[in-house]
């Protein structure tokens, strides 16, 4: 009986952890991450910036579906939401504390490396960031969120993609360099198994730099991506 309870508890913890993993990435064709969306209970999405600040949250009306007729629109969440009070640490007083029973913590004002005020945990998932001593192109950016890791191109890389995401989880990301056609240099070239091509500077003016292929929404290695062209 005891072993059964332990097993059930472990299964529940895994299910809860997976429920707050990275669900969606909104990224432009130039490789700029606009927001990272984490799934909570009741189809709630929590949007966090690449440097660990909460942007907004709400109910995902397109949960489980690939296409979105109104991309990025969240419906108001009617459940219980709590906030930190004025008596809490100055780095997170007034910030959201829990959404639908999922608790959110932040790094306190005493945290080093510029972490103060950034999201520290969402449910059981811990967030980590690149420290101030690391490369200037990505210091302060998110390093890991739960089981998902993030790497970034450094200031030593080609300037067309310096500071842009290099990998998200198991998906590697490449870009067109400064040596490529001016109409698409710096734009996404590949993400995971998906490749991107664009009209060049020799094409009709209205087409230059526009994508030749690639859907606006795609599931890649378990994460939904919204590409903004």
Cite the ranges covered by each PLM segment:
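Bacterial Sec-dependent N-terminal signal peptides
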Residues: 1-23
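Repetitive, compositionally biased segments used for assembly/scaffolding
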Residues: 24-229
């Amino acid at each position: 009986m005891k072993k059964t309870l332990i097993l059930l508890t472990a299964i529940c913890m895994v299910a809860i952890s997976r429920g707050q993993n990275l669900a969606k990435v909104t990224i432009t064709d130039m490789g700029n991450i606009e927001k990272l969306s984490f799934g909570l209970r009741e189809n709630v999405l929590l949007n966090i910036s690449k440097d660990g600040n909460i942007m907004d949250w709400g109910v995902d009306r397109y949960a489980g579906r690939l296409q979105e007729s109104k991309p990025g629109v969240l419906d108001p969440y009617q459940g219980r939401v709590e906030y930190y009070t004025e008596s809490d640490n100055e780095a997170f007083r007034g910030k959201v504390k829990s959404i639908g029973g999922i608790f959110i913590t932040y790094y306190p004002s005493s945290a080093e490396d510029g972490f103060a005020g950034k999201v520290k945990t969402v449910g059981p998932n811990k967030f980590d960031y690149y420290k101030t001593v690391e490369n200037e192109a990505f210091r302060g950016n998110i390093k890991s969120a739960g089981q998902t890791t993030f790497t970034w191109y450094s200031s030593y890389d080609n300037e067309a993609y310096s500071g842009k995401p290099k990998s998200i989880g198991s998906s590697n990301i490449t870009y067109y360099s400064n040596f490529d056609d001016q109409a698409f240099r710096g734009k996404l070239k590949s993400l995971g198994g998906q490749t991107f091509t664009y009209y060049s500077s020799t094409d009709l003016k209205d087409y230059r730099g526009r994508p030749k292929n690639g859907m606006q929404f795609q599931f890649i290695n378990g994460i939904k991506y919204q590409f903004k062209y």
